Design a protein with these regions (language model features):
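FAD-binding core of FAD-dependent oxidoreductases
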Residues: 259-266, 301, 388-401
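Short amphipathic alpha-helices in soluble, non-transmembrane regions
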Residues: 282-284, 375-382, 436-441
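Conserved small-domain helix->loop->beta segment predominantly found in fold-type I
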Residues: 1-62, 308, 324-395, 402-412
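Conserved aromatic
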Residues: 38, 132, 181-184, 368, ...
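Conserved PLP-enzyme active-site core in the AAT-like
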Residues: 121, 125-335, 340
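Conserved N-terminal alpha-helix of the aminotransferase class I/II PLP-enzyme fold
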Residues: 1-137, 158-171, 186-187
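Short, amphipathic alpha-helical "lid/cap" segments that border enzyme active or binding sites
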Residues: 427-438
């Protein structure tokens, strides 16, 4: 761990961001206090409320540079302040921090170009795309848009989601009802509660991460329509090239950090409004105000993403082929206990929203018949390893251990094994990845 220089930016500060925080602390913080820099004033204000509500301590906000704002907190409150940074994704990017540290001036104007490229993949109107500094920032904004409409209602989360998508609903509103398995009588009961208008919104991922399960989206959408409940769908794992969820959802959230970027060198998020939603006008108004006109994404990050998107379609198509190949290989391997992939798990539900030209995606999860051997298999795996997904190179992650280390028993009770290994399959020759897996699985 001492040799680890960086990690996922919401969990581990990038060296440039560390330097930015240190500089701000030196310039504006009193003795015994620290400064955390946020990209804009409203984020700092929300973080301030979160810290003061959680710890009942005094904090203050100071203007910093180029619209950034610093939240000054006691040393004892730094952990809680960084919880806000992690959960909400309202973060300063490494490029934004670097620009400040080097006194660089960056002109804007790239957001419209990026939206044009994205609109070609989603089918939505240009002005119905709203850009954020991270995928979680987009989810958090969508959640606050829901609270703006229904301030006293809980939300409903269907299927086991990405860790912080659930944390946001647990910590920043009225609570959440969580149904991790949308098959059987419990799902039928949840649908009835949706039809009765009990919830402020229904959240789900298509497919879920890391179990790659797909909820029956047409059925949920119909129940939401009957009950007057907004439906928020995250299509990050599948991408808008493989599935069309906008026909059912009121809002679609997407982490552009993943497959859209494909390189792992930029963070960004997006919320897309369904123009046919009965709340389209309210959502547009809220999101436009929240993004200061349509985009909060730092200009240089925007430019990098535009460049990365050039081979988006070709890359996703290749990952679809490789993902299916790897999933089939693992499914037939004698040492593998179970494989999660949209082709194998809830396949009917996935087909309901799959595009004619779409595939099953490049994300695969699996366990071993002898789970305790997974550490040896992981150590022997000659592939890149890390916590993200959607890169053009194959990336292996001991997902549960990284995302749910402090709640392993809870995750396992929800069907997510602590020994689960998640593969984000890249564009390499499929046989190269299979060869690496075969050698590693010799240790199983």
């Amino acid at each position: 761990m001492k040799k680890l220089e960086a990690g996922y930016p919401r969990f581990f500060l990038h060296p440039f961001v560390k330097r930015l925080f240190a500089k701000a602390t030196e310039e504006i913080a009193e003795a015994g206090k620290r400064a955390i820099v946020f990209p804009h004033k409203r984020a700092a204000q929300r973080a301030q409320r979160y810290v003061e509500r959680t710890l009942a301590v005094a904090t203050r906000i100071a203007s910093y540079d180029n619209g950034m704002q610093a939240l000054v907190v006691p040393e004892s409150a730094i952990g809680v302040a960084m919880e806000y940074w992690r959960f909400t994704g309202e973060v300063v990017s490494s490029r934004q921090a670097q620009a400040h540290l080097s006194d660089s001036v960056v002109e804007g104007g790239s957001a419209v170009i990026l939206k044009q490229q994205l609109a070609e993949t989603t089918g939505a109107e240009l002005d119905d795309h709203f850009l954020y500094e991270s995928g979680m920032a987009g989810i958090f904004s969508a959640y606050r848009a829901i609270l703006n409409l229904f301030p006293s209602k809980k939300t409903l989360q269907l299927e086991f989601p990405y860790v912080d998508a659930l944390k946001v609903q647990e910590r920043f509103g009225n609570g959440v009802v969580f149904l991790y398995d949308t098959e059987g009588e419990d799902f039928d009961a949840a649908v009835r509660r949706i039809q009765e208008g009990e919830f402020g919104a229904v959240f789900c991922e298509i497919p879920s991460n890391p179990l790659l399960r797909t909820v029956n989206l047409p059925r949920v959408a119909e129940a939401c329509h009957q009950g007057g409940v907004p439906l928020v769908v995250d299509d990050t794992v599948a991408t808008s090239l493989n599935v069309d969820v906008l026909q059912f959802a009121d809002l679609v959230t997407t982490s552009l950090t993943k497959w859209v970027s494909g390189v792992g060198d930029v963070m960004a998020g997006m919320v897309t409004v369904n123009s046919q939603s009965q709340w389209a006008s309210e959502f547009r108004s809220f999101l436009k105000d929240d993004t200061n006109g349509g985009s909060r994404l730092y200009t240089e990050d925007c430019r990098v993403l535009i460049s990365n998107m050039k081979n988006f379609g070709e890359r996703v198509s290749r990952c679809n082929v490789n993902g299916e190949l790897i999933a089939e290989y693992l499914n037939a391997h004698p040492a593998v206990g179970r494989v999660w992939y949209p082709k194998f798990n809830t396949p009917h539900e996935y087909q309901l929203i799959r595009r004619d030209s779409g595939g099953y995606g490049g994300l695969v999860s699996f366990t071993l018949k002898q789970p305790r051997k997974m550490p040896k298999v992981y150590d022997a795996l000659e592939l890149c390893k890390g916590p993200s997904l959607g890169t053009e190179f194959t990336l292996a992650s001991p997902y549960t251990m990284l995302a749910h280390y402090y709640e392993l028993d809870w995750a396992e009770a929800c069907g997510v094994s602590p020994n689960l290994l998640r593969l984000s399959v890249g564009v390499e020759e499929g046989e190269v990845v299979i060869g690496a897996l075969a050698r590693a699985l010799d240790h199983a």
